[in-house]
Amino acid sequence: MADQDRVEILSDRELGRTLVRLATQVLEQVDDTRRLMLLGIPTRGVELSRVLARELERMCGHPIAQGSIDPTFHRDDLERIGTRLAQTTTLPCNLEDRQVLLVDDVIFTGRTVRAAMEALHGWGRAQRVMLLVMVDRGHRELPIQPDFCGRTVPSRRSETIELRLRDVDGEEGVFLKRPIPPK
């Protein structure tokens, strides 16, 4: 029996179709895919960027630069969310004249993306920075919007949205998790 607090938003099949659609939209907006760099935001954004890079490589026929950017030390809300172990920032090449696509699983308040953009500026000046998210759940505290979005899912602040990827979790899909009320 499935957990009663977990609701499927995207099945593994729907997630696959959504990834293909997002990859297609990215290809339509990027001038030169050889200048494209995907940077995942920990934790699930890193794996999502790997999956997206593979799909883009399949579509355009050449490797896509892919890495990660850790925003931990640029956050303005560490005292509220608690400190986390910093992840390694991995840039596959210089940012200069690159079209950078920041990739995250879920956008919520916008604070993680703001911190990631601040961290990115410490590494150089990209030609263009775009944002791709699998799910936009609303509740923005900053004026940050994704350029590419897989699904918009209205949610309560008390709920969470979880992207599950086969390589990491053994299953694929997007799930809304509701807190179980006390008995």
Predicted segments, located by residue:
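PRPP-associated nucleotide enzymes
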Residues: 1-183
